[in-house]
């Protein structure tokens, strides 16, 4: 009942706060202008992550004690909010943003949110030792950027994040965790309320303010939950729960390297672009990705309770199916054919 109460409270807060943020965004010129590479056909409020941040943070202390983990999440989350706001307003350079993400990760590590070990499938643990900090930084920054890159259509990042974090919630409950499931439902409720205004046609975008904050909290949830478990399959759980954004980002990097393009260069090869290319409208493409994410989340939940060798077979099979599907969609190509590139909502 406590988790349900937390979800409902953050949901209501998000529903109340988001319209206020929409008005403030227009007033303070936190808006996204229409453009050739943009999905919006009119000026749209951005920095919507502020609403998600407030809906998450306001009740946080009522449901969880102010221990080191929560302090780190509050301080680091606020830092990520500020970084996102600066980027949404001034479009700061990628290197500066990357350094900011590393600083955000180091804040969590300073307060004890770190990956100290990986469960050894053959028994015991593999302690990371001096590699704890770089491994944790890599994980946090990677999750931040995967959520950031999947934020390409109305409601896409928010919906995928809800599914991923609810998967981590279910797994954390299985493992009798305390902090991770509460963080998960607080974030899920915040995103769910925001989604009402972010789903197509969007009245507000989450911006980097939202995508970086959400990615940051999801990373914290995975570290304090699934990755703290003694189960041998723990590493597979967050990777499957976040498989859509993780694989989409991985494919983007591979696509750009093999085509001699800068890794940070935008293109039309992401999964949502490819779904639009085969004739789907925005809503259909987004819902299709939701369904894929939900299936992968269900698999992540199921394998958490089975033997490692069986889980490994399932995990590898899923990855191979994803790669096959990506190839069929043409995700490894660089650009979409012009005739299939319309972002019109038909």
Predicted regions and their residues:
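Membrane-interface capping segments at transmembrane-helix boundaries
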Residues: 20-24, 199, 325-340
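A helix-boundary/kink motif common to multi-pass secondary transporters
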Residues: 93, 151, 280-281, 308
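Cytosolic, membrane-interface loops and tails of multi-pass inner-membrane proteins
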Residues: 19-45, 251-283, 341-345
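N-terminal hydrophobic signal/anchor transmembrane helix of membrane proteins
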Residues: 227-231, 313, 317-334
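Extracellular/periplasmic helix-loop-helix junctions in multi-pass membrane proteins
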Residues: 298-316
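"…together with the soluble PPM/PP2C metallo-phosphatase catalytic core" -> "…together
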Residues: 1-249
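Alpha-helical transmembrane segments of integral membrane proteins
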Residues: 277-295, 299, 303-304
């Amino acid at each position: 009942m406590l988790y349900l109460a937390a979800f409902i409270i953050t949901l209501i807060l998000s529903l109340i706060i988001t319209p206020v943020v929409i008005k403030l965004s227009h007033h303070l010129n936190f808006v996204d202008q229409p453009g050739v590479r943009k999905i919006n056909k009119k000026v749209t409020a951005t920095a919507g992550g502020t609403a998600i941040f407030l809906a998450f943070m306001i009740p946080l202390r009522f449901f969880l004690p102010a221990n080191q983990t929560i302090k780190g999440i509050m301080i680091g989350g606020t830092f990520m909010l500020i970084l996102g706001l600066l980027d949404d307003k001034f479009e700061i350079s990628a290197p500066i943003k990357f350094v900011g993400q590393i600083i955000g990760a180091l804040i969590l590590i300073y307060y004890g949110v770190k990956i100290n070990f990986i469960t050894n499938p053959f028994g015991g643990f593999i302690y990371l030792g001096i590699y704890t900090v770089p491994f944790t930084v890599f994980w946090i920054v990677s999750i931040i950027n995967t959520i950031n890159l999947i934020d390409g259509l109305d409601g896409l990042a928010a919906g995928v994040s809800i599914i991923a974090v609810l998967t981590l919630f279910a797994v954390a409950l299985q493992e009798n965790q305390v902090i991770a499931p509460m963080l998960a439902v607080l974030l899920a409720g915040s995103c769910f309320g925001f989604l009402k205004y972010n789903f197509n046609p969007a009245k507000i975008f989450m911006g980097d303010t939202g995508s970086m904050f959400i990615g940051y909290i999801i990373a914290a949830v995975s570290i304090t939950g699934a990755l703290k478990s003694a189960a041998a399959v723990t590493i597979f759980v967050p990777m499957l729960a976040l498989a859509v954004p993780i694989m989409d980002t991985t494919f983007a990097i591979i696509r750009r390297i093999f085509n001699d393009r800068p890794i940070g260069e935008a293109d039309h090869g992401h999964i949502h672009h490819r779904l639009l290319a085969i004739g789907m409208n925005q809503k259909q493409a987004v819902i299709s990705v939701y369904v894929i994410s939900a299936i992968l989340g269900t698999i992540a939940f199921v394998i958490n309770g089975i033997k490692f060798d069986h889980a490994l077979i399932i995990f590898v099979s899923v990855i191979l199916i994803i790669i096959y599907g990506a190839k069929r969609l043409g995700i490894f190509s660089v650009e979409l054919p012009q005739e299939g590139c319309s972002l019109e909502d038909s």
